[in-house]
Amino acid sequence: MDRSFASEIQARIDNKTKPLGALGLLEKVALELALIQSQDKLQSVETIEIRKPTMLVFAGDHGIAKEGVSIAPSAVTQQMVANFLAGGAAINCFCDLNQIDFKVVDCGMLSPIDTLVPDFKHHPNLIERRLGNGTANFAKQTAMSLEQVALGLEYGAKVAQQAILNGSNLLMFGEMGIGNTSSASALLTALSLLEVDHCVGYGTGITQEQLNRKIKLVAQGVNRCHDLDTKGALAQVGGFEIVQMVGAFLEAKRHKTPVLVDGFIVSVAAYVATLLDEETRDYMLFAHNSEENGHKFVLECLQAEPLLDLGLRLGEGTGAALALPLVKAAAQFYNNMASFESAGVTV
């Protein structure tokens, strides 16, 4: 990212009628948004625009779920996607409240949505980009092929591109997939210097006994990732929804479009994207710090300062949807707050 306007933008923020830094993280959000929207321009922007914020929820099933790493069976992935399309989930409530466009992407559930609700086959909020009927059990074998990784990156890029072409200049990603905290934990362990027990958490609310087993299963997958590159690790232990989110992050960067990053699984996808293209980090804002064990560690890897810490552990993109009003507030003060000079305030 071209940061040549950073000092000019910071001066504009500092000259608002407030003590220096008094708006905390909102000032950093305003700086980053203004920098992003100043790319390829001859001068820094005086107004931050937020147009058609769009939530993309990526859904997929995981073979590792057969090992009992979640309190819920894999069938719940499809059931929750049906709930999303019916408008009954938490993410629907928050998107409706904050006027966020909503789409759910079937990246590879065990079965397509119409096998459960035939009328949802052509639902306007459903995008089908299936890579298969769920991944393989990564505790025992490779989760997906390298060809599926490549196709998943392409599919995710196309989903993000379409949202941007439809008028969005701020994306949010969420996820749904029973077993996906195991996949995200394995990826984070394999691609960072972190220990497996730092990256694995309670997910949907498993017992201590289940957690101990989950750590062992994740370690089995991670052990196959030694000496592999990022895409190789994605193939070994990744998820269909995770790889498509990685592709979507990469595409958002190509379009110079910021992404408001949700919780643990989305943050791991963000981290993976930075390993493939470090400049994707310049186009990320971080919504919240969740209760999931590994989230604080991946945020540290990304040198991220999340806006909220509400004890959330739901996923779906809920943290990002809840943080959007703060992002809008950052734009609002940047656009409309008086300067010392215009207000006639002397300090």
Swiss-Prot record:
CDD domains found in the cross-reference section: DMB-PRT_CobT
GO terms of biological process kind: cobalamin biosynthetic process
E.C. designation(s): 2.4.2.21
SUPFAM superfamilies membership: Nicotinate mononucleotide:5,6-dimethylbenzimidazole phosphoribosyltransferase (CobT)
Pfam family, one: DBI_PRT
Keywords linked to the UniProt accession: Cobalamin biosynthesis, Glycosyltransferase, Transferase
Swiss-Prot/TrEMBL catalytic activity: 5,6-dimethylbenzimidazole + nicotinate beta-D-ribonucleotide = alpha-ribazole 5'-phosphate + nicotinate + H(+)
InterPro entries: Nict_dMeBzImd_PRibTrfase, Nict_dMeBzImd_PRibTrfase_bact, Nict_dMeBzImd_PRibTrfase_N, Nict_dMeBzImd_PRibTrfase_sf
Pathway recorded for this protein: Nucleoside biosynthesis; alpha-ribazole biosynthesis; alpha-ribazole from 5,6-dimethylbenzimidazole: step 1/2
Active site (record annotation): E316
Molecular function, one GO term: nicotinate-nucleotide-dimethylbenzimidazole phosphoribosyltransferase activity
PANTHER family with a match to the protein in the record: NICOTINATE-NUCLEOTIDE--DIMETHYLBENZIMIDAZOLE PHOSPHORIBOSYLTRANSFERASE (PTHR43463:SF1)
Membership in a protein family: Belongs to the CobT family.
Functional note: Catalyzes the synthesis of alpha-ribazole-5'-phosphate from nicotinate mononucleotide (NAMN) and 5,6-dimethylbenzimidazole (DMB).
Name listed for the protein in its UniProt record: Nicotinate-nucleotide--dimethylbenzimidazole phosphoribosyltransferase
Organism: Vibrio campbellii (strain ATCC BAA-1116)
